[in-house]
Amino acid sequence: ITNSEYRQFVNWVRDSIIRTQLADMAEQTGQTSGSGGIGDFAYLDTNTEKMNAYQQYLQNTYGDQKARKLNKKKALIWDTNKYPDEYYSEVMDKMYLPEEEAYNGKRIMDVQKFEFKYQWLDMEKAARARGKRKDFIKEEIVKVYPDTTVWIRDFNYSYNEPMHNDYFWHEAYGDYPVVGVSWIQAKAFCEWRTLNKNAYQKSKGDYTVN
């Protein structure tokens, strides 16, 4: 897997977390789409009249979270000078490291918050034991950002600080293999790829993959 491919995963996780927090804040503050502020990032199902029958069923049966849809058509705003309101600013501020951890006056995102959650079915245990299917469904929460410190930690006698700083993000290394990804992170990446593939298959009316 290349840096570019894994970077897509990291960015997707980052953006999904931000969009979810923006939608939650919009709901908490009563902001709705069209307000020009954080309301433009509200959950799409805020207007129940626009929900299809299946979404209405999910909401009525399982609660809001099963039917919630993020507004991914609205581009995220990264320029602090263009933040639409204080609520948006509050959400974005929480995604960055605190001021006291800023380096050379520049704050960076707290990559420890980039977490991907997924579920999987433990088929081996399910085959050996009796029980309900839900008893064998496992949930994983994985921090997805690669450990870039391996460049310094694993090469004691080399000057690898530039690689630590640039290797994962610089476009010049986009087609190079990703470094610092654990087995757990690799499995999470594969789950995400399957998720994307199934979304594409579903949009075409094709069978999904396991």
Feature-to-residue mapping (PLM):
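Extended beta-strand/loop cores of jelly-roll/beta-sandwich
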Residues: 1-210
